[in-house]
Amino acid sequence: MSNNDEHEEHEHEEHVHDEHVHEEHVHDEHEGHHHGHEPPNLEPEQHREQGVVLFNSVWEMLDMEDRTPAQDDQMVHAAHASRWHWSQAGELGGDQQLAVGEWQCSRVYSMLSRGEPALHHAQACLAICQASGLSDWVEAAAYEALARASAVAGNAGEARTWLARARTATAAIADPEDREVIDNDLAAIAVLPILSDG
């Protein structure tokens, strides 16, 4: 899940480039006196579009060989923003998008070697899958995220347990391309020093 082709396989979503979404600037009768910042009222379709755009932008940053600390922070914010926009998309969103949003947040934190938040979002991803009956590649991705986050957190035993569950779930994925994506991720986890040295 570290290149554009893999993103499309996981999301099955088109890149959305909306050049016609404009925010109106609202000025009250006391211009110059700000009484707080109200979030713009976006339509569900606009939330969906922002969720997709931000999701793809996170992948672009994950694919960068060298990121600055500022870019790391931007990547974290974009992942959370994407997840939030999907939660506001109504019927255009759904449990799968929410689970994948949590999965991406976990991947971002794992890439930044931040085990605790990586585990938190991986657990949230699995919880959504279990509560909504999601299976196939989404469930396998949740186990993959838990294995990766556990390894990052320094818990080799937990990482191996989740890795085994991820392999079982991955073997049951219907689409061979989706199965290959998860298999590649699991192979990368298996050779992490904390696991390959044990």
Please give the residue ranges for each predicted region.
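Residue signature of alpha-solenoid helical repeat architecture, marking inter-repeat boundaries
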Residues: 45-53, 73, 93-96, 137, ...
